[in-house]
UniProtKB/Swiss-Prot annotation:
Any one GO cellular component localisation term in the record: mediator complex
The protein's role, per its UniProt record: Component of the Mediator complex, a coactivator involved in the regulated transcription of nearly all RNA polymerase II-dependent genes. Mediator functions as a bridge to convey information from gene-specific regulatory proteins to the basal RNA polymerase II transcription machinery. Mediator is recruited to promoters by direct interactions with regulatory proteins and serves as a scaffold for the assembly of a functional preinitiation complex with RNA polymerase II and the general transcription factors.
Organism of derivation: Mycosarcoma maydis
Quaternary structure and interacting proteins, as annotated: Component of the Mediator complex.
Localization, UniProt: Nucleus
Gene transcribed to yield this protein: NUT2
Name of the protein: Mediator of RNA polymerase II transcription subunit 10
Length: 197
């Protein structure tokens, strides 16, 4: 894929494309500073994740959550690739090639089982997805709504806390002024103590 003036062209899906899944960005892992090289299965290779790849990803010096995320991402991409390959195989079934579709179905089942096995790793790595996000996905809503609502709630709570802080500061200033007026000798003693510090 050629790049023109540093910009990437969007990937075009054609009937001969290996997969509709996006190509990984070179040297980037979704904004994280650490890089882990996990081989993404291609259309010509078996789409199963080898245990050596998982072990290699876990052996690199990064936090456990990042390794689990990369493992999960690799397995999901593998499932998407296999489903795409299954669609291509089943769209063009010819005499004597029925076994290809059956093999792809079996590979999909194995990849889905491997993906299901990662749920225990997610719990161990404390990668909990908020229940609201899962419910939004189940109802077909955009999960970005949860992020927007969370940020709006956080901003309003921040404004409320800031208002309380300002009210306490104003009360302290009013109290200091009233104490200075009621006890002038206390004001002089306080001024001397601040000068000595």
């Amino acid at each position: 894929m050629s790049s023109t003036a540093g910009t990437r062209r969007p990937r075009q899906i054609t009937p001969t494309s290996p997969s509709p899944s996006p190509e990984p960005q070179p040297g980037a892992t979704n904004g994280s500073s650490s890089t882990i090289n996990v081989a993404v299965p291609s259309a010509s290779a078996p789409a199963q994740v080898a245990p050596s790849q998982v072990a290699a990803a876990a052996a690199t010096p990064v936090d456990a959550a990042e390794a689990v995320r990369i493992n999960l991402e690799t397995r999901v991409r593998s499932v998407v690739d296999l489903l795409y390959q299954l669609a291509v195989c089943s769209a063009d079934v010819q005499e004597g090639s029925q076994h290809l579709v059956a093999n792809k179905v079996n590979e999909c089942i194995q990849a889905l089982a491997a993906l299901d096995a990662t749920k225990d790793e997610l719990h161990r790595a404390h990668m909990m997805i908020p229940q609201d996000v899962l419910e939004m996905l189940d109802t077909g809503k955009n999960p970005d709504i949860h992020t927007r609502n969370f940020v709006n709630r956080l901003a309003s709570e921040n404004q409320y806390s800031y208002g309380q802080h300002r009210a306490v500061e104003r009360y302290k200033a009013t109290l200091d002024a009233a104490l200075d007026q009621a006890f002038p000798e206390l004001k002089a003693a306080q001024a001397e103590s601040t000068e000595t510090k």
